[in-house]
Amino acid sequence: MEFLSNKPLLITDTILRDAHQSQAATRMTIEDMLPALETLDSIGYYSLECWGGATFDACMRFLGEDPWERLRTIRKHVKNTKLQMLFRGQNILGYKHYADDVVDAFCAKSIENGIDIIRIFDALNDVRNLEQAIKSTKKYGGQVEATLSYTMSPIHNEAYFVKLAKELEEMGADMICIKDMANLLLPMDAYSLVKALKETVSVPIHLHTHNTSGTGDMTLLMAAYAGVDIVDTGTSQPATESLVATLKGTVRDTGLDLGKMSDAAVHFRQVAQRLQDAGILDPKVLRVDTNTLLYQVPGGMLSNLISQLKQAGKEDKYYDVLAEIPRVRKDFGYPPLVTPSSQIVGTQAVMNIIMGERYKVFPKESKAMLKGEYGQLPGQVNPEVRAKAGIAPEDVVTCRPADLLEPELEKYRQEFRGLAKSDEDVLSLALFPQVAPKFIEKRDHQPEPVSDDAPAVRELYVDAKSIL
């Protein structure tokens, strides 16, 4: 088989964001990262994914860290490599829709504090939910990596994703990311999809997958043959070293320094061992589980699902919940399982199993999704489930959900005037009004560390609420 591209394959390393989100419930601290940042910067990666996703919430909720300060610290030590973040479209980094002015301000502050590339996705692939974030990222000089949330269903096929990619390119995307959060993209399908995308759009293609089902390495290799431009690797993703060694001496040789990778790996193995000893990194998430191809559960959802069941004392229901997830997903119109739909579907599945009766209880987020408040669901919602949730057909939202929201930023500035010390604080408070106030109060009443190179003593919040 011949490579369809002769350009070196570019690599984004995810150790600073997705690796610990998917395997350790997002509990890696900035002190865990600091000793390796300059080594990571020297390896030659295209970019480092270091921020966004669940890290923002977890910094304040569990680690007692300011997420904005984390970003500034990483930027200070990573001078040569692009930094990128994961951004949930109109949900920003939260779990509901925010007004356009809040989305705009968050993009502005993310770029101002050090982000170069914003990977923007919508859990439902509703492009209306990406419009503002794409516009704002370009407005403030960032690069837009618009995302296809990959999944498998009667609706989601190759033609669907090719059409979506073309639409995103026309909206201004600088790159297109295939976000295979549950490791469902099989090797031959990856070859076919990447080839079709390269024939349809002119912007670079970036592939993000996992190794949950054991196919990740093969998927990346076949994508490399098909001409993919950039791939994600790391701890939760397929191993960087394996791919670099595989392509060495070929036309797609990455040119990355395996020796420096080894130095970084030694450090992060020690961090992983500490997290495992503390019971935070559960060995279950390190195993290959081919049942993923049935359950379609992404890595980040898996580790937090385990955490949620532990807290409820229902660990024995783990596989029952996994089996319930695809049933709920079908009833909800086949949403891809990525934040926030993964949390919504996952929590509904947990409730269905724990309560002993399906749909006895509907969390408010489930009702909001069934009502269309998150956007248009890809497929047909089970009308019996929607009716059981108390939603009449005429109540379903059909417009862009954010069009129903009035500007909010000035309201938040006034509301948090006495507490917020900066616009960054205002945004933290706007997104996480239950978590950010106590974090900011605690932050502002403890002494600053001498320097970011000296580990600070921080209080760890104990919060029984799972961020699934």
What is each stretch, according to the model?
Residues I11, A19, L40, I120, ...:
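Conserved, mostly hydrophobic/aromatic
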